[in-house]
Regions:
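Structural core segment of the AMP-binding/adenylate-forming
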Residues: 1-57
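Short beta-strand->loop structural element characteristic of the AMP-binding/adenylate-forming
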Residues: 1-16, 90-93, 127, 148-156
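Structural detector for helix-capping/boundary residues
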Residues: 5, 11, 56, 74, ...
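Conserved S/T- and glycine-rich ATP-binding loop of Class I adenylate-forming
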Residues: 7, 76, 82-85, 125, ...
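Residues at the C-termini of beta-strands that transition into short coil/loop
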Residues: 31-34, 55-56, 62, 129, ...
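Conserved pre-ATP/AMP-binding loop-to-beta segment of ANL
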Residues: 60-81, 88, 114-124
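Conserved AMP-binding A3 loop
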Residues: 77-105
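Conserved AMP-binding/adenylation subdomain of ANL enzymes
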Residues: 100-124, 132-166
């Protein structure tokens, strides 16, 4: 249905896809994400050729210059699926325009809070709302736009979160 071309896969989820038949899918590239030194070697069996690289290494090797292509602002940017609480799962699409307008509105609203209660460059953002929950209310896009440092803690584990906060 969504026909994704790129899969960003954290090593934590590798067991969920180890038997997936990538040759029958639209996925052309797999980008490996790992914070624990886990190698992607052997994880994808005969689909190892689809692994484009490790996320941090790809970022490090990338040029700081990029000429973004023009495309219609109503092009789909993200797709979310419901869990099917009222029937079959349903896909929800967000366009680039929707994400930009939401981010601008959110940044303007937060910038207008009294007593400097909003966010500003130099702040650190760590989402507690799951990413699948309406883009964590869209704030990761706003945080990127404003230039906040972002910390993504992974699975909800109270002790680990406290270690990150303290």
């Amino acid at each position: 249905h969504a026909k994704p071309k790129v899969l960003l896969l954290n090593s934590e989820f590798a067991p969920l896809v180890k038997d997936y038949q990538f040759e029958n899918s639209s996925i052309e590239h797999i980008i490996w994400l790992d914070d624990n030194g886990v190698s992607h070697e052997g994880v994808f069996g005969g689909n190892q050729n689809r692994v484009t690289g490790e996320y941090e290494a790809l970022l490090e090797a990338a040029s700081s210059e990029f000429d973004f292509p023009d495309f219609d602002e109503n092009t789909i940017a993200t797709t979310f699926y419901t869990s099917g609480t009222t029937g079959d799962p349903k896909g929800v699409f967000f366009s680039h325009r929707q994400l930009v307008l939401h981010s601008l509105t959110e940044a303007a609203t937060l910038g207008m809070l009294p007593n400097k209660q909003g966010v500003s460059y130099g702040d650190v953002y760590m989402p507690m709302t799951p990413m699948f929950h309406v883009h964590a209310w869209g704030f990761p896009f706003t945080a990127t736009m404003v230039g906040l440092k972002q910390v993504y803690p992974g699975r909800y584990a109270p002790d680990a979160l406290m270690d990150l906060i303290i």
